[in-house]
Amino acid sequence: MGRKRLSDFGNARLACHDVSCLRGDRLLFTHLSFEVKAGEAVLITGANGIGKSSLLRLLAGFLKPFSGHIEKWGRVAFADEALAMDRHLPLEKALAYWAALDGVLGAEKEAMAVMALDILADSPVRLLSTGQRKRAVLARLLASQAAIWLLDEPANGLDAASVRALIEMIEHHRQKGGIILAVSHQGLDMADYKTLSLENFVANSGQSSGFFDLLDESHFS
């Protein structure tokens, strides 16, 4: 399905070229090649322990490929269960700190409003509930204004209203030409996303090197 794109992230792109991932003495996946373009969303699937989260960390630059290489056009933001904020700061100041590092002063205010956190602006981070902490993680992601979002279980800990806000946030990001790569056991109700199954790239699976055709999945009504 076509979508109108704004110019914000129109040049965003991410590509893996024959990438293999080694954790400890275990080769998780190998010969993984794919490309994601501006406005696209990919859901990474596979059994527990197959390397879904490790792939996101490779794409974020936290890990190095055992072989192959990764190319990224556009800034990257990564979100998982870790809050990574000063527990003693008020929430707004904690988010403002990261927004300043990303060079987007003031972006935290809109991000807090989107995730319904503005009422908690003066609350210390340490007092946030589990659900509020997860919304703070997503607010930090939004405030970063990065083109490429890497989401590891983004819906965990969210109530139904917050999940809807997350999906709206994702779709707005894509309309601007942003990229989404996500891992989610709960699934994400994203429009016309694609699926990348790591089952096809486990070591000794017989999958040949080369670009893998992502499977189109229509979940848009």
UniProtKB/Swiss-Prot annotation:
SUPFAM superfamilies the UniProt entry points to: P-loop containing nucleoside triphosphate hydrolases
GO biological process, one term: cytochrome complex assembly
ABC transporter domain boundaries: 14-221
SMART domains from the UniProt entry: AAA (SM00382)
Keywords: ATP-binding, Cell inner membrane, Cell membrane, Cytochrome c-type biogenesis, Membrane, Nucleotide-binding, Translocase, Transport
GO molecular function annotation: ABC-type heme transporter activity; ATP binding; ATP hydrolysis activity
Known EC number: 7.6.2.5
InterPro entries xrefs: AAA+_ATPase, ABC_transporter-like_ATP-bd, ABC_transptr_haem_export_CcmA, P-loop_NTPase
Job description of the protein: Part of the ABC transporter complex CcmAB involved in the biogenesis of c-type cytochromes; once thought to export heme, this seems not to be the case, but its exact role is uncertain. Responsible for energy coupling to the transport system.
NCBIfam families found in the cross-reference section: ccmA
Protein name, as recorded: Cytochrome c biogenesis ATP-binding export protein CcmA
